[in-house]
Amino acid sequence: MTNIRKTHPLIKIINHSFIDLPAPSNISAWWNFGSLLGICLIIQILTGLFLAMHYTSDTMTAFSSVTHICRDVNYGWLIRYMHANGASMFFICLFLHVGRGLYYGSYTYFETWNIGVILLFAVMATAFMGYVLPWGQMSFWGATVITNLLSAIPYIGTTLVEWIWGGFSVDKATLTRFFAFHFILPFIITALVMVHLLFLHETGSNNPSGLISDSDKIPFHPYYTIKDILGILLLIMVLMILVLFSPDLLGDPDNYTPANPLNTPPHIKPEWYFLFAYAILRSIPNKLGGVLALVLSILILMLFPILHTSKQRSMMFRPLSQCMFWILVADLFTLTWIGGQPVEYPFITIGQLASILYFMIILLILPTISLFENKLLKW
């Protein structure tokens, strides 16, 4: 008799995805981040669900309800800080996952890649709306600044912003709808993750060499299940060290002050994982130009399959491209640092140079270097 694992309509889907899945024999730890992102999503949905049981999305009580969660709810402080720092872990894994895709040419699976970029946008939107919910100073002013950017859209901008706000400023209506969207989006993300995996399993995984690995496949279970469990344990360990020893390390102290529309904080800045995009936004003196640069800084990822000029898929055997890749990483670190600095000399100039370099490396330098490396192959 055939194993139920292979015959049952539901179980066989799980079997083909996580058990009998043929996987390349040489994929490194950089391939762990997909499963880690899955774990992050599960942690965020579970902790978020328990937070939603005690949270109230009203301007009068939102801040107090978060305080109540931390003080009065059993292990409420743990749930709240796991959720807040879980978001940081989520973005660390996301950036590493995307970086892996860029380095090893995984973007040539363009359906998988494009859904991944849409997922990145969806997670960023969810994180932004989640940051507004505690209704502290940075929540309120962050929401005001970022939503206001839409007013840069010609003709419909102002109307659009007031429609999103549900009034003439960020207020009760805004908070309530942000909570509703923040609750629903993770489930939409989960559905998109399934589509992401569906397209990935049409082609199979890439591997560090970038070569076709059909001739050398191993079953996902037990080899990669045990490898994923190791990654998950490390992820949870780092998350719990962060939560239990320095839960406010990555947060902003301004968010412990209740939202006050009459008092603007000296430095309005988003959470650390948005700082690179915020720096690009601020580096252009024009409002519409800044908004376009902000959107393009992420949307540019969709151009990678078109901009790939090399005859090799992976950067494993392309030292010049490797060098530019790591300069791009250093540039993103620079942008992240600049995003958290005040708008004054020399930070303005550094930010503008780093922003120009970011787009230059992706649009011009990497494709040109790849063509040069193709020539080197003929020597």
Swiss-Prot record:
One GO molecular-function entry = metal ion binding
Q: Does the keyword Cell wall biogenesis/degradation apply?
A: no
Protein keywords? Electron transport, Heme, Iron, Membrane, Metal-binding, Mitochondrion, Mitochondrion inner membrane, Respiratory chain, Transmembrane, Transmembrane helix, Transport, Ubiquinone
Is the keyword Transcription regulation in the record?
no
The membrane-spanning stretches of this chain are 33-53, 77-98, 113-133, 178-198, 226-246, 288-308, 320-340, 347-367
Domain of life of the organism encoding this protein: Eukaryota
Q: Name one GO cellular component term.
A: respiratory chain complex III
The membrane topology of this protein is: Multi-pass membrane protein
Q: Which Gene3D superfamilies match?
A: Cytochrome Bc1 Complex, Chain C
Q: How is the cofactor bound?
A: Binds 2 heme b groups non-covalently.
Q: Where does a ubiquinone bind?
A: H201
**Where is heme b b566 annotated to bind?**
H97, H196
- Signal peptide range equals none
Among InterPro entries, the record links this protein to: Cyt_b/b6_C (IPR005798), Cyt_b/b6_C_sf (IPR036150), Cyt_b/b6_N (IPR005797), Cytb/b6-like_sf (IPR027387), Cytochrome_b (IPR030689), Cytochrome_b_C_euk/bac (IPR048260), Cytochrome_b_N_euk/bac (IPR048259), Di-haem_cyt_TM (IPR016174)
What's the miscellaneous note?
A: Heme 1 (or BL or b562) is low-potential and absorbs at about 562 nm, and heme 2 (or BH or b566) is high-potential and absorbs at about 566 nm.
The record ties this protein, via PANTHER family, to:
CYTOCHROME B
Designated name of the protein: Cytochrome b
The organism that produces this protein has a lineage beginning with: Eukaryota, Metazoa, Chordata, Craniata, Vertebrata
